[in-house]
């Protein structure tokens, strides 16, 4: 859950990169997320090697449950990395106000998608997760349209690629 909180803050900070110079904060949060990811990996590895201990301490029933935690941690860590990169490219790019507003709108859609996906994970709502996976394609198409309209802008390819990877 700490990684989730960090990822949400990073997405929000990346979204406001045009208005605020917060790239250093994003960079620091990414290091925190990386540290927590490796800690989670070590804990999961311990749990797989010592299932009885983990079962007693954390009420975890199976190795499958541990692997689900690993998948969630990997997903969140990827989101953190791509949010950091997207913020870097937004910082480097020179967009007009219309482009900035459109990009912030896309970022808001991605942020909503991430929050809803994590909610589906926490509540174990598979149906919601599957619907969100289907709606992901729509956001990717919005990213592609944004790229096509602005393909002559510096860093746009890298930025759009990171936005699409964030989902």
What are these language model-derived features?
Residues 1-167:
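Cytosolic, long alpha-helical scaffolding segments
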């Amino acid at each position: 859950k700490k990684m989730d909180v960090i990822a949400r803050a990073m997405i929000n900070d990346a979204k406001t990169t045009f208005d605020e110079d917060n790239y250093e904060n994003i960079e620091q949060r990414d290091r925190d997320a990386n540290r927590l990811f490796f800690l989670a990996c070590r804990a999961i590895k311990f749990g797989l090697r010592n299932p009885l201990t983990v079962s007693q301490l954390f009420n975890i029933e199976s190795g499958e449950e541990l692997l689900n935690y690993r998948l969630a941690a990997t997903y969140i860590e990827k989101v953190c990395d791509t949010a950091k990169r997207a913020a870097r490219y937004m910082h480097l790019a020179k967009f007009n106000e219309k482009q900035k507003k459109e990009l912030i709108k896309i970022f808001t859609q991605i942020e909503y998608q991430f929050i809803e996906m994590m909610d589906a994970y926490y509540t174990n709502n598979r149906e919601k997760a599957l619907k969100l996976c289907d709606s992901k394609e729509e956001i990717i198409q919005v990213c592609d349209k944004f790229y096509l309209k602005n393909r002559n802008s510096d860093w746009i390819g890298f930025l759009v690629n990171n936005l699409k990877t964030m989902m």
